[in-house]
Amino acid sequence: MASHKLLVTPPKALLKPLSIPNQLLLGPGPSNLPPRIMAAGGLQMIGSMSKDMYQIMDEIKEGIQYVFQTRNPLTLVISGSGHCALEAALVNVLEPGDSFLVGANGIWGQRAVDIGERIGARVHPMTKDPGGHYTLQEVEEGLAQHKPVLLFLTHGESSTGVLQPLDGFGELCHRYKCLLLVDSVASLGGTPLYMDRQGIDILYSGSQKALNAPPGTSLISFSDKAKKKMYSRKTKPFSFYLDIKWLANFWGCDDQPRMYHHTIPVISLYSLRESLALIAEQGLENSWRQHREAAAYLHGRLQALGLQLFVKDPALRLPTVTTVAVPAGYDWRDIVSYVIDHFDIEIMGGLGPSTGKVLRIGLLGCNATRENVDRVTEALRAALQHCPKKKL
């Protein structure tokens, strides 16, 4: 029998059933879940080290190899969001004193700089204003000057809406004995990406964008060059949880008996498996086409409202996340609030260096439809009519 009186009573809020609003998520992610992925989240638990779970993990690895377009054996899932995958890449590849070149044209490059500094690397940011991208010439100048072991680029910069070209960067990096790390969290499934053909050494992405899975798992793959760098390091990675040698074994990437590392998020992996199955059934090229066509339709509807697209060059616009310049005289927070309060549609403002400059509209996976474009543009039309506007 308990000997002490409880100091904390049951929270009243938890004595009521959970209630979730029905909203259309057209921000930069997470996205709405298709019925098949929602159903996967309600399946019964199995053992995290059972043969059935290992089979699911192997199927997930094959799915990642398909969406990444890679044959890398060292391909797995990180139990954490895209930030976790970025940190896993950096803590395993970089050692204190290593030179690290970063394309910092938005918040994700800024985060890479932060993590690199925490590791003790010599970090060299190539800083650009929101909306900027990198040319081969600019990167080659950085490679020649700083002689880095690793270059970071964001393929889909969701805070600014920029799609970074990747062709030629892998070959360029390898000429300077540098590895190429690419963030594809916001671009995967929405625009062409070829890990092996483009010479990308480390590629990672997240579950909650165009894959339409719940947040909390991330996808990552390493080339043989990246594996050699990680496996020949002189010091242990400072994170045990993100140690790729352990994770590679647990995910069956090293042909050795699997050993326990951590308890994986079994239910989340069911959902991720189903999201990869859906995109495999649709076909990558069809998924890319769907996002390209939906984005083009959105751009036309936005311009018909008199709104200006933040990224001027159509070739550099990220199909999955469109950035719109905040219209003159309006507070972006008023527009975002009006759209969610009156239409149950989520859009977002800027993030990091783009805060206050843009509105962000996401067309991710199953949400990339003309019907959703019509809904969000009508909501924006109403917001522009009813939100307060300052005289300029």
Curated annotation (Swiss-Prot):
What cofactor is needed? pyridoxal 5'-phosphate
Impact of altering G161R? In HP1; loss of alanine--glyoxylate aminotransferase activity; reduced expression levels; decreased protein stability; protein aggregation seen in the cytosol with a decreased aggregation propensity in the presence of pyridoxal phosphate; loss of dimerization
Q: Which residues carry this modification: Phosphothreonine?
A: T9
Chief location of this protein within or outside the cell = other
Q: Look up what happens after changing G82E.
A: In HP1; abolishes alanine--glyoxylate aminotransferase activity by interfering with pyridoxal phosphate binding
What UniProt keywords are attached to this protein's entry? Acetylation, Aminotransferase, Disease variant, Peroxisome, Phosphoprotein, Pyridoxal phosphate, Transferase
Q: What is the catalytic activity of this protein?
A: L-serine + pyruvate = 3-hydroxypyruvate + L-alanine; glyoxylate + L-alanine = glycine + pyruvate
Please state the Enzyme Commission number of this protein: 2.6.1.44, 2.6.1.51
The subcellular location is: Peroxisome
InterPro entries (alphabetical): Aminotrans_V_dom (IPR000192), Aminotrans_V_PyrdxlP_BS (IPR020578), PyrdxlP-dep_Trfase (IPR015424), PyrdxlP-dep_Trfase_major (IPR015421), PyrdxlP-dep_Trfase_small (IPR015422), SP_NH2Trfase/AEP_transaminase (IPR024169)
Where N6-succinyllysine occurs, the residues are K225
- Which illness does the annotation name? Hyperoxaluria primary 1: An inborn error of glyoxylate metabolism characterized by increased excretion of oxalate and glycolate, and progressive tissue accumulation of insoluble calcium oxalate. Affected individuals are at risk for nephrolithiasis, nephrocalcinosis and early onset end-stage renal disease.
Q: What does this protein do?
A: Peroxisomal aminotransferase that catalyzes the transamination of glyoxylate to glycine and contributes to the glyoxylate detoxification. Also catalyzes the transamination between L-serine and pyruvate and contributes to gluconeogenesis from the L-serine metabolism.
Listed under subunit, the entry gives: Homodimer.
What is the protein name stated in its UniProt record? Alanine--glyoxylate aminotransferase
The species is Homo sapiens (Human)
The gene for this chain is: AGXT
